[in-house]
Amino acid sequence: MAQGSNYKVPFRRRREGKTDYAARMKLVDYDKSRLVVRLSNAHATVQVIDYAPEGDITLASAVSKQLANYGYLGGASNTSAVYLTGYLCAKRALAKGVDSAILDIGLKSAIKGSKVFAALKGAVDAGLDIPYGEAVLPDESRINGEHVANYAESLDDDEIAKLFSKYLERGLQPADLPKNFEETKKNIDEAEE
């Protein structure tokens, strides 16, 4: 640990790797809400948040675990699930009167085609007005899971049972992921209107 009178201890949340205060200050200066995307190895959380001096106010929220309520059988942390989570959160935000936001990716790197931008595309497709560049969005085939279905078709039954055991436990054949994705999106549209 550094010592001396010139040593400055960073803020606790900065030390823990949770908050980039410089980026946060730029985001809260806007009069718009923030679409906050947070990813873990198991799930994704998408929230629409407003700044308030006494603490941020969550206007709408969705977690990828909630997709099972709409019939989604795929994994909760893949690109399809993150897109649907962004879509669900935006539908809830629109129902509460929020029509525009800016993207807040926290400490994640802005990598073209990443899951963070899949959530952004889901929110934009649901009707939320968010500024973005088309180049950063993932391909449509990655969002709806066609690449997983194509990969599964190239495998034999033993490899499918080994690599997609969780899908099979839930009753989903990997080749049917795009169809399940579309059904889930339709169910979200029907339930959130």
Curated annotation (Swiss-Prot):
Q: Which domain of life is it from?
A: Archaea
Name the InterPro entries on file: Rbsml_uL18_euk (IPR005485)
Does Ribonucleoprotein show up as a keyword for this record? yes
Give a yes or no for keyword RNA-binding in this entry. yes
Q: Which GO terms describe its cellular component?
A: cytosolic large ribosomal subunit
Which keywords does UniProt give here? Ribonucleoprotein, Ribosomal protein, RNA-binding, rRNA-binding
In the record, what terms sit under GO molecular function? Answer: 5S rRNA binding; structural constituent of ribosome
What's a single GO BP term from this record? ribosomal large subunit assembly
Q: Could you tell me what this protein does?
A: This is one of the proteins that bind and probably mediate the attachment of the 5S RNA into the large ribosomal subunit, where it forms part of the central protuberance.
Q: How does it assemble?
A: Part of the 50S ribosomal subunit. Contacts the 5S and 23S rRNAs.
**Family that this chain belongs to:** Belongs to the universal ribosomal protein uL18 family.
Q: HAMAP family from the entry?
A: Ribosomal_uL18_A
Q: Which NCBIfam families match?
A: PRK08569.1
UniProt cross-references to PANTHER family, sorted A to Z: LARGE RIBOSOMAL SUBUNIT PROTEIN UL18, RIBOSOMAL PROTEIN L5-RELATED
Q: Could you identify this protein by its name?
A: Large ribosomal subunit protein uL18
